[in-house]
């Protein structure tokens, strides 16, 4: 059996003097990671341009349903780079399919020194789920740990039950995907054991590449 151990960076530590949460803060955006902000649409309205500029925002992920398009709009497309996603805040919505493109967009922003805001309508469920998934995959941690990390910075987050289930399933998916990337063609023909680094604990034995692929497809259609 081949052991493939994945290494992940450490999560940035909490600020020593974290600001006490107050109810009006739910209408503002909070910085979750250096350069990554989470908030509601009220933080991305036209009247907030000066706040965007003060915070150094360069990229925005705007999450909405088609029926919300009349009031949730990418207001600064001439000034910032946008990724607009059509996601319903519904437990049966397949949100996993949006995780890879969101991660690519966020990574592209942060790696070039930019700053990104992820927002939906309230900044509580859909956008929070994308941020949690990003932290899970980037730092190799479980859903509960990623949720706690985000909630310490934006207390009001509350992904719906279907999103929570998919986030819990996503750990196996991203670990399998990263492991396949690291493996040689010879290793792909052998049984393998996937281990996350010190920050994760998932250990999954798989027979071959086909089983990995099937696992990803089936998990992505749950919830």
From Swiss-Prot:
Q: Which processes are annotated in GO (biological process)?
A: negative regulation of SCF-dependent proteasomal ubiquitin-dependent catabolic process; regulation of ERK1 and ERK2 cascade
Q: What family classification does the UniProt entry report for this protein?
A: Belongs to the protein-tyrosine phosphatase family. Non-receptor class subfamily.
Protein name according to UniProt? Serine/threonine/tyrosine-interacting protein A
GO annotation, cellular component aspect: cytoplasm; nucleoplasm
Task: State any single GO MF term.
Answer: F-box domain binding
Organism listed in the record? Xenopus laevis (African clawed frog)
Q: Pfam family example for this protein? A: DSPc
Gene that this sequence comes from: styx-a
The protein's role, per its UniProt record: Catalytically inactive phosphatase.
Q: Where is the Tyrosine-protein phosphatase domain?
A: 28-176
């Amino acid at each position: 059996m081949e052991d493939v151990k994945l290494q992940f960076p450490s999560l940035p530590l909490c600020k020593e003097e974290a600001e006490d949460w107050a109810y009006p803060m739910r209408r503002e955006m909070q910085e979750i990671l250096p350069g990554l902000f989470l908030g509601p649409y009220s933080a991305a309205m036209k009247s907030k341009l000066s706040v965007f500029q003060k915070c150094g925002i360069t990229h925005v992920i705007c999450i909405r349903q088609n029926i919300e398009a009349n009031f949730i709009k990418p207001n600064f497309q001439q000034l910032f780079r946008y990724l607009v996603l059509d996601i319903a805040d519904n437990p049966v919505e397949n949100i996993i399919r949006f995780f890879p493109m969101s991660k690519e967009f966020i990574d592209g922003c942060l790696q070039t020194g930019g700053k990104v805001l992820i927002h939906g309508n309230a900044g509580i469920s859909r956008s929070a789920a994308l941020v949690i998934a990003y932290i899970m995959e980037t730092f190799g941690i479980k859903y509960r740990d990623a949720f706690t990390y985000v909630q310490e910075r934006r207390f009001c987050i509350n992904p719906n039950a279907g999103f929570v289930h998919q986030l819990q399933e996503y750990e196996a998916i991203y670990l399998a995907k990263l492991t396949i990337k690291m493996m040689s063609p010879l290793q792909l023909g052998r049984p393998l054991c996937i281990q996350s680094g010190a920050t994760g604990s998932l250990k999954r034995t798989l027979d071959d590449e086909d089983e990995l692929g099937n696992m990803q497809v089936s998990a992505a259609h749950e919830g």
